[in-house]
């Protein structure tokens, strides 16, 4: 018997159950089986979403930066377990925070600015 662990990022064009079915069908062709511990849909909101706009407005109002736009990244987040929520973080342009590395960091000034963005974001979200 051979076993392996696979960490799949579900594309925004598919549902988690569709990916599960594709894996099951493929393994069945090879007389294999799959045991899925957790699978869910991807987390994605279009740029025009009121949530994205509220968060982006908070960022622009605090930083004055209109050049950098919201970005979508592939990654896991516990935000997926809640409805109508977006993962929103303090990564500021121009700084390599070495995210998820042994020497990951954030500048104190960056954290202070992020807190101001979060405060503005909460006000904007409450207004939706």
What are these regions (language model features)?
Residues 33-128:
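An extended, acidic, His-containing surface patch that forms the Zn2+-binding/catalytic region
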Residues 1-24, 40:
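Midchain, well-structured core segments that form catalytic/ion-binding scaffolds
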Residues 1-3, 29, 83-85:
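Active-site lining segments that contact anionic ligands and/or coordinate catalytic metals
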Residues 6, 28-33:
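Transmembrane helical segments that form the transport core of multi-pass membrane transport proteins
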